């Protein structure tokens, strides 16, 4: 049984999503798919998460948000159009984006987190539908339903100990479960995010919870390199690392894997790819 996580750059376009589909189809052991929000399609593009931050700032400052809402909704619609299938989820996605601007601003410590989490959450809905339209029995699972219960620390959520028992129940499903990364739900039902880049954390937590044999982390680079491939020409790859070595690299700024994703995996002796 495997848990796989796809970063934003791996989910940025129809071409990338077709690759994701083939990766999932190629191995029936890949039963849990954790997804980030759509990333940049090119250097001039905007990440959906950054667009949601802009939307949040405009909303809380009383600025008209119609353009923000339309851009985000059209971003998801563009992927559907490029993939060439009729989505029934798009109506729900559009409503969820628009409904953010109806949430209370005053005394709402989790408003920012709720805005940001919409990127991953809506992407998971869309990807699960895309899988179903292409022969994979897939189901979207909200972190609340999955059992990803976290502490009430906006922007810095921590998984609660009892969450792992609930997550283990997901093993019983025969479907491919698509779970949004980056956020969980507090005991009083508030959306609360991990730190930025926290989809890695979700993937590791899910892998530990379902007692996966392997946790695969797909990103836009083929492995871990000795230097940044965008700065150094053809740096050599590092085929194997201990948890301690990976932790030190993550703390030093290597962005391939979030440093907080290591502990859940370490406790279960999981393998990262």
Residue ranges of model-derived segments:
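Nucleotide/pyrophosphate-binding catalytic subdomain
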Residues: 1-262
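Short glycine/threonine-rich loop/turn motifs
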Residues: 268
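Conserved small/polar residues in nucleotide/adenosyl-binding loops
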Residues: 271-273
């Amino acid at each position: 049984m495997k848990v796989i996580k796809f970063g934003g750059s791996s989910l940025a376009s129809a071409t990338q999503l077709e690759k994701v589909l083939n990766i999932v189809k190629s191995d029936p052991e890949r039963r849990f798919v954790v997804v980030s929000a759509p990333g940049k399609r090119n250097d001039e593009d905007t990440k959906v998460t950054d667009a949601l931050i802009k939307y949040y700032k405009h909303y809380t400052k009383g600025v008209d948000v119609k353009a923000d809402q339309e851009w985000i909704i059209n971003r998801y619609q563009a992927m559907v159009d490029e993939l060439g299938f009729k989505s029934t989820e798009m109506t729900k996605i559009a409503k969820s984006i628009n409904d953010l601007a109806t949430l209370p601003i005053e005394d709402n410590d989790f408003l920012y987190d709720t805005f940001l989490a919409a990127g991953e959450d809506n992407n998971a809905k869309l990807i699960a539908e895309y899988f179903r339209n292409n022969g994979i029995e897939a189901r979207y699972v909200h972190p609340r339903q999955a059992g990803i219960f976290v502490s009430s620390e906006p922007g810095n959520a921590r998984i609660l100990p009892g969450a792992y028992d609930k997550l283990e129940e997901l093993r019983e499903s025969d479907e491919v479960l698509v779970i949004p990364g980056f956020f969980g739900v507090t005991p009083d039902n508030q959306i609360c995010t991990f730190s930025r880049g926290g989809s890695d954390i979700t993937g590791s937590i899910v892998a530990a919870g379902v007692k996966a044999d392997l946790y695969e982390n797909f990103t836009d680079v083929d492995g871990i390199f000795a230097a940044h491939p965008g700065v150094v020409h053809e740096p050599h790859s590092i085929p194997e690392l201990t948890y301690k070595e990976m932790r030190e690299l993550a703390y030093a700024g290597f962005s391939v894997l979030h440093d907080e994703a290591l502990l859940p995996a370490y406790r279960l002796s999981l393998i990262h790819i």
